[in-house]
UniProtKB/Swiss-Prot annotation:
It comes from the Eukaryota. This is Uncharacterized protein C12C2.04. It holds the Pfam family ox_reductase_C. Transmembrane segments: none annotated. GO terms for cellular component: cytosol; nucleus. To S.pombe SpAC2E11.17. It comes from Schizosaccharomyces pombe (strain 972 / ATCC 24843) (Fission yeast).
Length: 384
């Protein structure tokens, strides 16, 4: 992996093409995600969004109208809109001066993440620009798992800079926990991940369809499957076991579903609670508990690590993240926190810093093969 050289921004200008005009790239009411906002903070006055690619032009126009009325208008005032990456790449054929320094891909997973035509957006770009820099949101694909691993092998042919949007790896409490584990040479015996989401403002209809979103584990709990692997290592996928509360169970009836769930076929309705367990190849055990039961807006999240004499607990990943550590020296926990830490900012600072040559490639903490392993675990849990 090398720093981007293809049309690297001259004169201090950094050109970005954004794929997707939806919530992950431009924000939603029920969460802190807003990729464009973080890119704006990292790049400041040097940012120029030269392309916004989205199949619905009216969505692109709505976003651009809002941006051009804001204090970052300078970055969007000359943005061109396209309905597909194919159309955009055809434009670049005759306008090489507009080749971007990076692509920000934040769209549903149906269009990328494998080698199948129509779902191979990464390859579509890299065949023309093999040194391109791609930031790809999770989940990496909706294709069969083997398709994602096929793409892992194809990507080895290119010199692309690729970062997957597992932002929690970049939290300072997570990195502090990684350092604590390494410094104390801990042999992790168990990881316990808990993710309780607030559902009443999640009014994206596709999210409530199993076949469209992939289900809540693939779409949402994926973050904590990823963190579990980050600390626990590779999973023995033959050991995965799952229990769940479904929509038709008495305790699965939700009072404030923000969409007309009756319009969704019964076989497509998503589970309310999922409990999964597995063994890592190291012999350790992993546990995941995910729910869509909370109301309001705040999520409740926690990841625990257990090792001989040590208990490491990370909480409130979407709010004010805190790290609790109990060691053999004392029964009481010590608390470590980093006020106002923003993992979204941290991941884009790392990605863009590598593209600019400010950081070594190792600053990117989630590569495509990491994303493929996480996707594999979430699909096995979902299909179990």
């Amino acid at each position: 992996m090398t720093a981007l050289s293809t049309n690297s921004s001259s004169g201090g200008i950094f050109k970005i093409a954004i794929v997707g005009a939806g919530g992950i790239n431009f924000g939603t009411p029920e969460g802190p995600w807003n990729n464009a906002q973080r890119v704006e903070k990292v790049l400041g006055k040097s940012l120029r969004v030269t392309a916004l690619i989205n199949p619905l032009i009216n969505e692109s126009e709505r976003v651009l109208k809002s941006k051009c009325a804001s204090d970052v208008a300078f970055a969007y005032e000359n943005t061109k809109t396209y309905v597909s990456v194919t159309e955009y790449l055809e434009y670049l054929d005759s306008h090489p001066e507009d080749v971007p320094s990076a692509y920000l891909i934040g769209i549903p997973p149906d269009f990328h993440g494998c080698t199948t035509p129509g779902m191979d957006m990464e390859l579509e770009i890299l065949r023309k620009y093999p040194n391109a820099a791609l930031f790809i949101e999770k989940p990496i694909t909706s294709a069969p798992v083997q398709g994602a691993f096929n793409l892992v092998h194809e990507l080895e042919k290119y010199h692309a800079i690729i970062s997957i949007g597992y932002m929690f790896r970049y939290l300072k409490i997570v990195q502090a926990a990684k350092k604590y584990v390494a410094d104390n040479n801990l042999n992790i015996a168990c990881t316990i991940a808990r993710y309780n989401s607030a559902y009443e403002h999640n009014n994206k209809l596709f999210w409530w369809y199993m076949s469209k979103s992939g289900g809540p584990v693939v779409e949402q709990a994926t973050h904590f499957c990823d963190l579990s692997i980050y600390f626990g290592g590779d999973v023995d996928t033959s050991t995965v076991k799952v229990n769940r509360v479904n929509w038709y169970d008495p305790c699965g009836k939700l009072a404030k579903v923000p969409v007309d769930e009756e319009s969704i076929p019964k076989e497509e309705r998503i589970p309310r609670f999922t409990a999964a367990s597995w063994k890592y190849k190291s012999g350790a055990v992993g546990i995941l508990a995910h729910s869509i039961i909370l109301q309001g807006t705040n999520y409740d999240t926690c990841l625990e690590l257990q090792a001989d004499g040590h208990y490491v607990r990370m909480v409130d990943f979407y709010g004010q993240p805190r790290l609790y550590i109990r060691s053999p020296e004392a029964d009481s926990e010590r608390i470590i926190n980093f006020p106002e830490d923003d993992p979204y900012y941290n991941e884009f600072d790392a990605f863009l810093g590598v593209v600019q040559g400010r950081y070594p490639p190792s600053r990117i903490l989630s590569k495509f093969d990491d994303g493929a392993k996480t996707y594999e675990l979430t699909k096995i849990i979902t299909n179990n």
